[in-house]
Amino acid sequence: MSPQTETKANVGFKAGVKEYKLTYYTPEYETKDTDILAAFRVTPQPGVPPEEAGAAVAAESSTGTWTTVWTDGLTSLDRYKGRCYHIEPVPGEETQFIAYVAYPLDLFEEGSVTNMFTSIVGNVFGFKALAALRLEDLRIPPAYTKTFQGPPHGIQVERDKLNKYGRPLLGCTIKPKLGLSAKNYGRAVYECLRGGLDFTKDDENVNSQPFMRWRDRFLFCAEAIYKSQAETGEIKGHYLNATAGTCEEMIKRAVFARELGVPIVMHDYLTGGFTANTSLAHYCRDNGLLLHIHRAMHAVIDRQKNHGMHFRVLAKALRLSGGDHVHAGTVVGKLEGDRESTLGFVDLLRDDYVEKDRSRGIFFTQDWVSLPGVLPVASGGIHVWHMPALTEIFGDDSVLQFGGGTLGHPWGNAPGAVANRVALEACVQARNEGRDLAIEGNTIIREACKWSPELAAACEVWKEIRFNFPTVDTLDTQE
């Protein structure tokens, strides 16, 4: 008998295909504190039992493949395999269920969101035995969290850098998002910052196009920042989008921003990729730059309820990879966002310890072990009438960003910024006096209009604007 044949015989190798559930469905398994836990919404093909589908997810996202291989005998599968340890039905959905999978920590490279996602949401999402698959939530264990730097600075450090406390921060995305020259772009930035905003922002697809190259934009925006700071006595910033075609070019743009002395840069973390994002976050921490994160492309991944990945997972991944701000929906604006679900992942972005709460879509208790928090950014179709609701929903540790709601003011950009600042200050003062923003919000705004003609004009323009469409990605009703 040859040595190779002898090895196969000794490990009891038997060629062929066997059911996944014989190896990867282990309902008796007790999860460990070091396991990464995942909750998948699974829709199996007709005829595929839930246990087999759940086990297939565990197998194909860890050590398994479609057939038995003799090299299984050269390692300890019990140590390295993913395990489907629990299955539960989805209320109101006969063909869907939640499969809970535990992954040993040794399966993942330290400090790499890229590697974690390559395994957990890799090829398994194209598996033919599944009609659809969605990753609803992840529990990141402290042992793995501690291998990440996380956000470059975090909420408290940002407030200290900006010297701004006790209220949400105010921003504005410059519009039109494409087509302005660098000088006209810088003019709009100056007018908004001079009017009372804390930040202005490059839109996600502003990189370095023929009509406005990145270096020119950076220079004119820096001039606008310094001029508005000198005139207002407040620290100002503009999210300079450093996203580029290569990591090297991205870092070059961040270096130039640092040389200009501006406080913050920006990255499109999903289109740019997690490897690029983590690299930029490390640079920002080392060089004192805040990092604003845009989530362009997220709805391709997270909007459909039965396939893809919920944004709460992308939010957790961003906190690991690094970012000081991230767009998180508005609940009340033009973009998708269920209220309870949004509040759930907002807490996961900001808080150090978040308890399991299925009523808000949180499947696992998450301990961030002092990883810095991320400011959620509310942006998309919001205006001054939304200010009470936004202040009540998101609280002080947030960024409220009005693009069209600033630049669409009938009197111009600076009056639009004034209107938003007055509305915010009125809401914060009313809240601090004990008034209920959810009930008295419109009254508070009308009262402020009496001493702010800019706010009164904005209220008149947008009094009829509504985005009353049902949310596609709603929470399941728990029995």
Swiss-Prot record:
It catalyses: 2 (2R)-3-phosphoglycerate + 2 H(+) = D-ribulose 1,5-bisphosphate + CO2 + H2O; D-ribulose 1,5-bisphosphate + O2 = 2-phosphoglycolate + (2R)-3-phosphoglycerate + 2 H(+). It is found in: Plastid, Chloroplast. Transmembrane segments: none annotated. The disulfide bond which can form in the large chain dimeric partners within the hexadecamer appears to be associated with oxidative stress and protein turnover. Heterohexadecamer of 8 large chains and 8 small chains; disulfide-linked. The disulfide link is formed within the large subunit homodimers. Its cofactor is Mg(2+). Mg(2+) binds at K201, D203, E204. GO terms for molecular function: magnesium ion binding; monooxygenase activity; ribulose-bisphosphate carboxylase activity. It comes from the Eukaryota. Binds 1 Mg(2+) ion per subunit. The keyword Chloroplast applies. Residues 1-2 form a propeptide. Substrate binds at N123, T173, K177, R295, H327, S379. The record marks K334 as: Transition state stabilizer. It holds the Pfam family RuBisCO_large. The active site is at K175 (proton acceptor), H294 (proton acceptor). It comes from Nasturtium officinale. The modification N6-carboxylysine is found at K201. This is Ribulose bisphosphate carboxylase large chain. Belongs to the RuBisCO large chain family. Type I subfamily. Keywords: Calvin cycle, Carbon dioxide fixation, Chloroplast, Disulfide bond, Lyase, Magnesium, Metal-binding, Monooxygenase, Oxidoreductase, Phosphoprotein, Photorespiration, Photosynthesis, Plastid. The modification Phosphoserine is found at S208.
